[in-house]
Every structure is written in C-alpha cells, then in structure tokens.
Amino acid sequence: MCCKAIKLGNARVFPVTTFRDAKKVRWINLLKSGKAKRNKSGKIIKQGEFQSKDVQDARIQPYRRWFSNTRVISQDVLNMFRESFAEKLNDPCKVLLKQNKLPMSLLMEPTKTRKANIIDIEPFDDTFGKKSXRKRAKLYASSIENLSNFAFESYENYIKKNSEYENVDKNIQKSFEAIFSKGTSKRIWNELYKXIDSSDVIIQLLDARNPLGTRCKHVEEYLKKEKPHKHMILLLNKCDLIPTWCTREWIKQLSKEYPTLAFHASINNPFGKGSLIQLLRQFSKLHSNRRQISVGFIGYPNTGKSSVINTLRSKKVCNTAPIPGETKVWQYVRMTSKIFMIDCPGIVPPNSNDSETEIIIKGALRIEKVSNPEQYIHAILNLCETKHLERTYQISGWENDSTKFIELLARKTGKLLKGGEVDESSIAKMVINDFIRGKIPWFIAPAQENDPSNIKLSNNTLVEKNHLTTLDDEIYNDANPNA
C-alpha cells in the first residue's frame, strides 16, 4: 500500500511501515511456490507447483473425425494420378507441387524386386518339423530361373562398377604427376557436398566449347539417387566462343535432361542474365513457404562460376582469375532478399579413362606447373583449324608437326635459349593458355541425330580435326578483336 509523508515543520518525514504492496506479495509467492511443505520427518505434506501426481480423468472428444480416415482415395483416381505422374516424371520442365498432399508411396512404382516368398524358400516342415535343417542356405530366389537372373544381374553390376580394370594389364599401372590430382582432394569434395547440402537449386556450369567433357555425371547421379528433391540447371557458359547454331543444338540436346540456358559472363555486356534471373525467381515461387532459397554453383575448374555470380550482382563480389583453382572455399553471396548464391570450388570427377591430355585440354590444371607441356601440343593442333592457328600466330608451313610448329612460333616470338635453341616449354605453355582462354577458336560440334556419320561424343573422347565443324570468320573476329 502507498504511504503518505507527514509534514513536521519544514521537514517531510515518511513513517516507518512494514506493509507490502500487491506486487511484492506476488513476487514472494512466486519464490515460495516451487517448494513443497514438509513435516518434521521430512515427508511432503503439500506439493509444490507441478509436483502433484494427481491427474484428472480425461476423455476423448466424441467427434467422428478422430475415428475415420483422414484422406481417402479411390482406385480409379489413384490410377489416374499414377499415369499422369509417370508421364511427367522425366520431363525436366515439370515440377511437382505440394508433394506432401499426394500418396507418393502408392504413386511411385517400386524399383526393387520383391523378395521371394519365405514359405517357398524354407518350408515349415523343414524348418520346425522332425526333418528340420536350420543350416540350409537361404536363397534369394524361389526357382532356378530367378536364381540365374539374379546371378546375371550381379555379374553385370560387378562389371559396370569395375569397368576401369577392363583391358588393363594388372602388372602395369599408370603413373600420373601430382599436379594431375588437383581438384580431387577430400577437402575439395567436402566443400562441394557442403554447397550441395545447403542449396535448393544447383546450377552446373559447362564450357560451351566442350559441354560433355566438362559435365559432372557423378554429381548428377548422386543428386538423382540421394537428393531427388533438389533442382538442377545446366548453364552453357562462354557461349560467345562458339557459333549460334552450335549453342542452339547443345541446348536442344541437353534440355531433354535438365533445364539448359546459354550464358556469357560479363559485368558490362552479359548474355542470358535476364533469363537466368527469371528462372531462379520461378524456383523461388515454388518454395513460397521459405523465407529464401539458396542456389549453388558447381562444375569443373575454370568454367566461370565466380564470374557468373559477379555478372548476376553486376559488380565484383567473388575473386576471379583466368586460371583454375582461384576459389578455395565455398561462400555465400546475396542476390536478392529471397535468393542467395553459393560459390563452390571447382571439382574434377574421378575417371580412370581420362588421360593427361584430356585433363589439360579441359582447363582443369595450371599449365605453369605441368612438366614437359610440349607433348600436348599435337592434340591441340588436331582440335584446331589450321587457318585459325595461322591467323592467330602469323606462321605457316608446319604440316601438322608439333615440333616444327613450336620451332616456327619460337623464332617468330623470339623465345630462344642460349645458342639459338628453341624454348619449347615456354612456347607450349603459351599455346595451351591461348587454347584454354579462347584466343584460338575451337569447339566440339554436337552429334546430329539425322547424320549417322557423326560420332557421339563422350566425357573421355578427344575429337580429331575431321570431326570438327569449321568456324566462321565472325566467331574468329569475336575471339580475336585485334586480329
């Protein structure tokens, strides 16, 4: 309660009082409420707050909703859903909305074969009867035909997993330099899986000059098997280095599997920026229940992942360099209030069939650290047109001889050692860098479906000169503005 002051002369004196106001009383009761009252023997006489074990009788609400099926679907509707779902399942441009509202366990066809009936494998009399034999082998099939099919499938899977050991002498092992193991370390793969786990949409960057060679099939199979709910986009970067018809054909073929876009990473003069932003906003609307989505950029080294992020932000937010391995760790970059981007280091998927030449041509290594680079010049001469090399370096007459080509170019540029010897290593590194950075026009043409003479390219196949389509002068001038 409130106490009033008493005026005695010129002084105001507050009387001494022991009364407590209501707030103080509630505070004291709160402190005492958690303790139980005990007698002299220590037994609890009165329980404290939340210590009582007495429970009131409860009963279920008499409501029909608690005792009936929550969701019911007829067989006809289920068949309709199953047919429509099977038609749209492999369409890369279709996305399933509200997956939790559908009986996915009934719609999805079981991929695994059902196990054989246990009674057919182990009869009751042979297991628990007088003739019981508990040590008999447990077979995975109920008949000889099923057993032979199971053995054949197991053999095919074994051959598929161990295909790298086919036609290889066990006593001979390939010896690679330490530099060729870059991009395959455990740390790099940990960074990749961090970015994949944190991303809702994954953009795989491909070099438009060699899309199949810079494609990570291992990551695609991992996403299909382990994380089918994540969205994948293929981005053909460096499309300014190849003709328009070639870009159109690659997009036509790759769009059958994933949404594919053409892109040219440039802060001042980009191409495909609006289409990519619009596509990411569509994915953001699909996840309207989230505050934001994350977009991860993965791919081979030197495919332009950081450059694409800088292009989308219209300023430099990630360090870039024309050499592979510039990005060491993953990093978050904000694009909009609802879209975040994740930059990831480049990875080189393991492939036992890849040779040293193929790894270098894909641009996955730093050429200055490679020993004897002149041995890879012959493959570059096969991939590039002769007239483009002549126009780039102003030399001619090497007749597809890599040694003579290096000698002519060294004397043209003046890169000679003591005694007038040719500096083959410096010339080879210069040519390989020009080849990777687009100063020498080249590209791998997509296989035409109607032309049987074309050879379908794979990840580990180098194309000879006669399989390439001649570049036009327009592409050459774009790649060499000073020529």
From Swiss-Prot:
Annotated Gene3D superfamilies: 1.10.1580.10, P-loop containing nucleotide triphosphate hydrolases (3.40.50.300)
Ranges of residues in domain CP-type G: 189-350
Pfam families, sorted: MMR_HSR1, NGP1NT
A Gene Ontology term for the protein's cellular component: nucleolus
Origin: domain of life: Eukaryota
PROSITE patterns recorded: G_CP
MF (Gene Ontology): GTP binding
InterPro entries reported for this sequence: G_CP_dom, GNL2_CP_dom, GTP-bd, GTP-bd_ortho_bundle_sf, NOG2_N_dom, P-loop_NTPase, TRAFAC_YlqF/YawG_RiboMat
Keywords: GTP-binding, Nucleotide-binding, Nucleus, Ribosome biogenesis
Keyword Endoplasmic reticulum included in the entry's annotation: no
Family: Belongs to the TRAFAC class YlqF/YawG GTPase family. NOG2 subfamily.
Name by which UniProt lists this protein: Nucleolar GTP-binding protein 2
